[in-house]
Curated annotation (Swiss-Prot):
Protein name listed in UniProt: Single-stranded DNA-binding protein
One GO MF term: single-stranded DNA binding
Alphabetic keyword roster: DNA damage, DNA recombination, DNA repair, DNA replication, DNA-binding
Region named Disordered: 118-167
Record HAMAP family: SSB
Record text on subunit structure and interactions: Homotetramer.
Role: Plays an important role in DNA replication, recombination and repair. Binds to ssDNA and to an array of partner proteins to recruit them to their sites of action during DNA metabolism.
The UniProt record lists the keyword DNA damage: yes
Sequence motif Important for interaction with partner proteins, location on chain: 162-167
Record's keyword annotation contains DNA repair: yes
Biased composition (Gly residues): 118-146
Domain called SSB: residue spans: 5-111
DNA-binding region: 54-60
Length: 167
């Protein structure tokens, strides 16, 4: 294989308000704790089971840090795209520690707020135009999903098209 891919996609809920810190360089970083859950019914007992995984997310992109600081709260539902990285450090007792995190670098990664418990409703951190991307109007679609027409006096795009095929 010529290359490799390191991409993580999560849709989950924040377990706490974002933690915002400043680095020595003056750059700001947001740390998020995101829970993803899966549920199933036990075949033998019929009992409903649930398993929750907790993920550490670190955001280095200043614009996304601002979005996290202003709009995200405990319980907010988010869509995250980032890269998996493992950090290694030595604690106060001299023991080596490891932490695996989903990292959103300055120019890579995505954070989209989805409607849900936190009261947020489909705001996207990415750019976008009035025909799609950006705000998705309720968080039901992300990543280009369904397009909506802009509101206002503009005519719809299809009004300019002729119904007849020219050949």
């Amino acid at each position: 294989m010529a290359g490799s891919v390191n991409k993580v996609i999560l849709v989950g809920n924040l377990g706490a308000d974002p933690e915002i810190r400043s680095l020595g360089s003056g750059d700001r970083v947001a740390n998020l704790r995101i829970a993803t859950s899966e549920t199933w019914r036990d075949r033998s007992s019929g009992e409903r089971k649930e398993k929750t995984e907790w993920h550490r997310v670190v955001i280095f992109n200043d614009n996304l840090v601002k979005v996290a600081e202003q709009y995200l709260r405990k319980g907010s539902t988010v869509y995250i795209e980032g890269a998996l990285q493992t950090r290694k450090w030595t604690d106060n007792t001299g023991q080596e520690k490891y932490s695996t995190e989903i990292v959103l670098q300055k120019f890579r990664g995505e954070l989209t707020m989805l409607g849900g418990r936190g009261g947020d409703a489909g705001m996207s951190s990415g750019g976008g135009d009035e025909y799609g991307g950006g705000y998705s109007g309720g968080g039901s679609s992300f990543g280009g999903g369904q397009r909506s027409q802009p509101s206002g006096p503009r005519e719809s795009f299809s009004a300019d098209l002729d119904d007849e095929i020219p050949f």
